[in-house]
Design a protein with these regions (language model features):
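PRPP-associated nucleotide enzymes
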Residues: 1-212
Length: 212
């Protein structure tokens, strides 16, 4: 697993807003959008491109365009908070949706939605989830995406736990793990007894969408 922690003062400032328990939803969502923009920007740095020729008002010059249409896959529900930023940077991307609910006793995910293209071969795939905690949800999604032909997947997370990174390394086939990239704003200290990331930022889904 290739880990890239985005080290940038603006990313650190946005992450600070997200961590602060006093941040209300109307400030949390814009801060997440800003940070997701920076994370996706870094995550797409190695996107394959192809040369094109364009004509400016003055001359003909060389340019580039994407070699294949990307696929972004937010993990519902928290990953939806990162989707607008991803689509703003990748307007031609296809969107897959994976809905998971966490069992609060076992901390294991149960899928309730898997709207994913049948053939992902040749498409750069970006899995969006603010929290990489135990790695259980990410592993479920990654196995699904791999079964549909995806290779060289990139996980885009706000914060990751060391336990989650270890789970990805050990829970995937060696070749898939070697091709996997994780882009995050921070790797935090640990998981607590209820499998929440410490210091983390709480329940990202609740902080984005509220809890009635």
């Amino acid at each position: 697993v290739h880990l890239h922690v985005v080290d940038h003062p603006l990313a650190a400032m946005a992450l600070t807003v997200l961590r602060d328990e006093r941040t209300p939803r109307d400030r949390f969502r814009p801060a997440l959008h800003d940070l997701a923009t920076m994370l996706v920007y870094e995550a797409t740095r190695a996107l394959p491109v192809m040369p094109v020729t364009v004509t400016t008002p003055l001359a003909t010059t060389a340019g580039t365009r994407l070699a294949a249409e990307p696929v972004v896959a937010p993990v519902l529900r928290a990953g939806l908070g990162m989707l607008p930023a991803a689509l703003a940077l990748l307007p031609t991307a296809h969107t897959a949706f994976i809905g998971l609910a966490r069992d609060e006793t076992t901390h294991q995910p149960t899928a309730y939605l898997e709207s994913v293209p049948d053939d992902l071969a040749g498409h750069p795939v970006f899995l969006l989830d603010p929290m990489l905690a135990t790695g259980g949800s990410a592993l479920h999604c990654l196995r699904l995406l791999l079964d549909r032909g995806a290779r060289g997947i990139t996980v885009v997370a706000v914060v990751a736990a060391p336990e989650g990174l270890v789970a990805l390394e050990s829970g995937l086939p060696a070749d898939a793990a070697a091709e996997l990239t994780v882009v995050a704003a921070a790797v935090d200290e640990r998981l607590n007894d209820t499998a929440y990331i410490v210091p983390g930022l709480g329940d990202a889904g609740d902080r984005i969408f509220g809890l009635m």
